[in-house]
Structures are given as structure tokens and as C-alpha cells.
Amino acid sequence: MKPIILTLFTIFFLSTSSCIENEKKETKKTTQVNLSENKEIRVQLEPKNNSGAIGKLRFNESKGIVKLEAKFMNLSPGIHAIHLHEKADCSLPDGKSAGGHWNPTFNKHGKWGDENGYHKGDIGNFEVDENGNGRVTMETKEWCINCEDQTKNIVGKAVIVHQEADDFFSQPSGAAGSRIICGGIVQ
């Protein structure tokens, strides 16, 4: 009788441990998500108001940070303002088809990062050398490329360079003068 009980016990033990083993194998399946996905948009800017100026930009998003790298040529030497505007429409000769500054949070115009508020499109000023060349580089967590948060998504907006510097005070645009380069941020 003991051998039969021992045999039955052994069979039972082996069959239940096999089920436990299968159960463990099933729970080991996981889904991996690639969090380091990079997104990139390149923008060619065209002259407006007969400026003859041109430019190119690259927006790159990695790990929740958007980096802007821009290069401009044929501008007048001095300080110029750069902003993101509401619409990726540069069809009018004066660039006004791009609308006003991109301001999805309805803040006052101001200098980027100002605790009193600023538009998400208020990038700021940059210097142009005596040869007409200028560069802008910045990084921010306040933008995203083609995300669902419309207070951060830059796709569908326009990049505008103005003839003059932004005074960071005048409402709603900073008194930066005419629009001399425009390019739509599109995918």
C-alpha cells in the first residue's frame, strides 16, 4: 500500500509542479517600450517682405526635450527676434498668414522663462554678424513634436524671424518689426 501511495503522491507532485512551471513561464512575458524614440523635423525658411534672407532649422525631440538648431543667412547685421507663430502658413508676401505668436496658454508676451509669463512662441533675440549670418540654439521641455498636448505641440506652427529685436514688453508682439523669414513646421 505504501508503494501505491508513494507513486500517487509522486505523480500528483510532478503534475502540479509542471502547472506551476507553466504558470511562471506565462507571467515572464513583458512588453518593451522604446522610451528613447527620437523625433525630428527640418524646416526651410523663405524670405518675406522682399528681404532676401533665408534660413534652415532642425527640431529634434529626445527623452522629452526638444532641441532647436537654426541657421540664418542674408540678414541685416544686428539683433533680430525669432518666434513661433500660430499657423504653418507662409503664403502671404508679408508672412502675416502665419497669424500671431503661438500662445496656447494665454499668457502675456514676454521673455522666454519670465516668471510673469510669456508665449510658448516667444523664443527671443539673436545676433546677426556683419556677413548677415546668425544662429539660434535652445532646448526646452515646454515643446513636443506631434504629441497630443496642444499646449506643447509645435507641429502646425510657423517660425518667423523679424527685422528688429523683441523688446519683451510691448503687447502682444514685442514690437519686433516686419516678418522677414517664414517657415512652416510640418511633417
Predicted feature residues:
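C-terminal motif of bacterial Sec signal peptides marking the signal peptidase cleavage site
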Residues: 15-18
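N-terminal leader/targeting pre-sequences
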Residues: 20-79, 84-187
